[in-house]
Amino acid sequence: MIVDTGSNYLTAQSIFGYAHSIKSDNSCKVVNTELHFDHIGGNCFFRAKNIDIHAHPGTQRTPDEFLANKKEFNDTIPDPIRRSKNESDAFFLKTDLENPNRSIAPGNTFDLGGVNVDVIASPGHTRFNLSFFAKSDGVLFSGDCIVSHYLPYLGAVDISAWEVWLQSLDRIEDLHPKAIVPGHGDIIKTSEIGKELDRMRKILTDAINDTNRDNL
């Protein structure tokens, strides 16, 4: 199972290469945890190979949003000459928008041939975030519901979604994972899970409290 396809075609090509090198005759099951382009940008590589992409039905973007993402990326290039030449085109080489073509929902299970992976609702970072839990191994792929060391991005949603996000963290903790593969950052080992979840909770709680104070 490949969880998220990276930002672009070339990233997805590398991910596929690693997966293929482990066991070349394995079929690929590909899932997206969310709709942000750093998670779905490489979908085009897999769809070109006729490999299905599974995700929440809300994981859909428009061509205009994809073009805006490319422009935003280009605008972050510090060098004005490189920026004026649209150097981001190199980053997005061969990359086209491909939305997931197979819908999944919390409660679904993937049978990977001896390992079952459960689909877990983990909204908050976006309203449609999913996580994936291989219970027999105790490994949870959290997407951006959890990031280690990084600060989570809160700007895609509002305070009501942050409160839902806290519930998602509780749901994940109740699964008692042995390891968490976050959306960004290092793999979180058993001994670090409680600390990382508490760090995420504090960031979200502080943001909620600050917003409530501003609204008084």
Tell what function each PLM region has.
Residues 103-134, 139:
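Core dinuclear metal-dependent hydrolase active-site scaffold
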Residues 65, 71-72, 150-160:
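Acidic/histidine-rich helix-loop elements
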Residues 49-52, 133, 139, 161-215:
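Divalent-metal (often Zn2+) His-rich catalytic cores of metallo-beta-lactamase-fold enzymes
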Residues 9-10, 35-41, 60-64, 126-129, ...:
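Active-site environment of divalent metal-dependent phosphoester hydrolases
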Residues 1-23, 131-144:
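Conserved beta-strand hairpin/beta-sheet module of binuclear metal-dependent hydrolase folds
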Residues 6-7, 153-157, 191-195:
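Short, solvent-exposed loop/turn segments at secondary-structure boundaries
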Residues 3-6, 27-36, 54-57, 121-123, ...:
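Active-site neighborhood of phospho(di)ester-bond hydrolases with catalytic His/Asp-centered motifs
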Residues 10-13, 17-105, 109, 202-209:
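Active-site HxH/HxHxD metal-binding segment of metal-dependent hydrolases
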